[in-house]
Amino acid sequence: MTDTTSTITSRRTPSTLAVWAIFAILFAAVQIASLFTPALLDDADASHAQAAQHMALTGDYVTLHVNGLRYLEKAPLPYWIEAVSYKIFGMTAFATHLGNSLALLGCTWLAWLWAGRAWGQRAGFYAGLGVLTAVGPFLYTRFAIPEALLSFFFLLALYCFLTGFESSRPLRFYGMWAALALAMLTKGLIAPVFFLAAALPLLILSGLWRRWRELKPFTGLLLFLLIAAPWHILAGLANPDQGNPVGNHPTIGHVHGFWYFYFINEHVLRFLGERFPHDYNKLPLSAFWLMHLVWLFPWSLFIPALIAAAWKSRKTWISQLRGNSGQTVDFYLDNAVRTDVASYIVGLKFRVRTTWLLSIFSVFTLCFFSLSTNQEYYTFPCWVPLLMLVAGIVASTEERRSFEGSEPRLSTRWLTYAQLVFAVVGVLVALALGWGLWSSRSLPYVSDIGTLLAHRGVGDYTLSMSHVFDLTGPSFAALRLPAILAAVALLIGPLAGWILRKMNRHLEATISVAITAAIFLIAAHIAFARFEPMLSSKPMADTLLSKAASSDQFIIYGDQADASSVVFYTDKLFHKPTLLVGERCSPYGVGSTMVWGSCWPDAPRVFISEQELVSEWGKGNRKWLFAQDANQQKAMQLLGSKLIAVQTIADKTLWTDRPLAQ
């Protein structure tokens, strides 16, 4: 299929200019407006930001460092992007998360382009709306993780792979190899593994494997290596094995270097659940799968229609995929009324191959992370393909076109029922929010929502959504504005959409889904920002910046991740690693991301014992001590009256060792 091949023209679909005007408004309202607040979050968000901060300040773009120690477990491209962003915009939350938002915009563009080419302009429009307004893509671009960038490169590689065969343009395949290399620099070995898991079955089932030379396997692989290999080689040379490491538990002076740690510990052993340290968790299988209804919401409501369409067309799955499909006498007779049967065949094949490729990629991604250790967002790369498939069936059903060129068409009742479910869900959620608002109506607004939350510790807080389960009735006192906004949107929007669907005004009904979701996401971001005292320690960093001297020492009782935002924001003041109360190179994995780096013989002094803390407290330069949750009691038992409280926020306290007047 050439670039000039006409695509299906969708009646009443907005023009390209109008579509991108809508996309721009949604992107600005949902993504850009949320880049400024909240501040960087403790744990992964600010820890990853520290690695990029070190790059920007030192110019070392090979070996990642966090709090002065080697941090070898991640691929570098996201940190390179953040470091460049820091150079341009300064070291802020905006600069940290801008790359994620731009990657999501790139996914929107590719979804619009690809779905529009496969199923028509309306499908492209809906695919873009889905990417910009689904819950999962919004939620997991709020902090510094590489999944949005990885999804963009995956989508680009798959699109270049498929269109390369359609257009017979070598540049498309070179684009595929380049995108794969960048994906590997984003997330590691899963890039080629996931791509091959989708591409190889399609090549075999469709017969395209006979055209394997067009893939440019030799020169393309060379391009892949030219892009991906240099950093891996340099990182390995800069971080070789130290001493005589044995097994997977390092000891001081005896630690595996980059090659083992990155490829074996972080890839193979993480998949098997044997990685050290064991600072991660795994969702129950049923929850892992069912939560995708949330990540793709509200567009997941149309998944039953997608499944129904796939079942109705099951008899043509393979026949339309093979190289000679559409070339029989019966096929030409059935389509004799078409003005250009050849173009129809080409378009049909592209649509069928798109469906297969996106489906295989999505299923493999879901199954892979069902077996391995996982976080909720690990399947992010398959969310955009699933949204594209949903957009294709919704648009085809609205326009009363047969799916994959076969009969029968899917009834629009499937869409009406989905809209009805959305309306029911909207009413129920609005009622729940209303109850929360009513029950907290007499409570005063409390800026520190952390004092109103229950600390239930779901998943021991190793899952990204653990804090959601800490919500209590009184916490609605701090969430009145976002709760009201979400309740109104969910009460009115879905009902209006259902009425429009009943009136056969399908385009307007589907747009109403996106508008409702966008307003809900804006409300969700306002609520998320209200959680800042609980999730970020930036106010304590501000206190240090205003009261501490550069000669002072900041100490964390516990893991660096507990106050990683303080470490990030105060780096410009202290210019030295934060001390951690704990065991260096702990055999039990205490210290999490700091463990491996602290085992290196040239590692700076970062860990101190409790005895050292007691002996040094109150002596020399001023000390500042941070402790969170259970560590607060430990610190108070250890130092007692020697602690001078400076600030308490949520479950975090900042102390110093002498009165501030001194």
Question: Model-predicted segments: where are they?
Answer:
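Membrane-integral, polyisoprenol-dependent glycosyltransferases
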Residues: T2-E407, S440, K572
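Membrane-embedded architecture of ER/inner-membrane glycosylation machinery
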Residues: T2-T7, T16, Y174, A309-N324, ...
